[in-house]
Amino acid sequence: MASTEEVSQERSENSIQVSMTKKPTFYARIGKRMFTGNEEKNPFDEVIITGLGNATKIAIGAASIMEKEDIGQIVKVQTAYFSSDRINRRIPKITIVLKKHPDFVAN
């Protein structure tokens, strides 16, 4: 289910890039809002959560919370290495794709 490859820095509107500064619940709430939408933004049917290095566990935690609360379903997990120009090494990256759970109702 997972693959390893070199990745670029492209990011789409339905993407959440997590960091170590916030907890997984914070990013799970953002994902829920992306599925719900608001006056300024239309809802998405798919959300992509990515994490680099030590933030991979935060990305996994956020996706797990969303799946446990029937907000989204994990449809794809991809691992890769991110090459940084600043440091001369490759950094592990995880990308988790969730689609809106069929039972999810925006409140």
From Swiss-Prot:
GO molecular function, one term: DNA binding
Consequence the record notes for mutating residue 76 to A: No effect on nuclease activity
Temperature dependence of activity: Active from 4 to 70 degrees Celsius.
Subcellular location: Nucleus; Chromosome; Chromosome, Telomere; Cytoplasm
Listed cofactors: a divalent metal cation
Activity regulation field: Mild acetylation lowers protein interaction with DNA and high acetylation abolishes DNA-binding activity. DNA binding and endonuclease activity is modulated via deacetylation of Lys-23 by Sir2A. Inhibited in the presence of EDTA and EGTA.
Record carries keyword Disulfide bond: no
Domain of life of the source: Eukaryota
Result when mutating residue 57 to A: No effect on nuclease activity
Record carries keyword Transcription regulation: yes
Result of altering residue 54 to A: No effect on nuclease activity
pH dependence per the entry: Optimum pH is 7.5-9.0.
EC number(s) on file: 3.1.-.-
PTM comment, free text: Acetylated. Exists in both acetylated and unacetylated forms but predominantly in an acetylated form. Deacetylated by Sir2A.
N6-acetyllysine PTM sites in chain numbering: 23, 32
Function: Possesses DNA-binding and endonuclease activities. Binds DNA cooperatively in sequence-independent manner at the DNA minor groove. Exhibits apurinic/apyrimidinic site-driven endonuclease activity. Binds RNA; shows high affinity for poly(A) and a lower affinity for poly(U) templates. In vitro, prevents transcription after DNA binding. Associates with the telomeric region, the subtelomeric TARE6 repeat sequence and the var gene promoters.
Family designation: Belongs to the histone-like Alba family.
Record's subunit section: Homodimer. Interacts (acetylated and unacetylated) with Sir2A.
PANTHER family: DNA/RNA-BINDING PROTEIN ALBA 3 (PTHR31947), DNA_RNA-BINDING PROTEIN ALBA-LIKE DOMAIN-CONTAINING PROTEIN (PTHR31947:SF36)
Protein known as: Endonuclease ALBA3
Lineage: Eukaryota, Sar, Alveolata, Apicomplexa, Aconoidasida
Gene that this polypeptide is encoded by: ALBA3
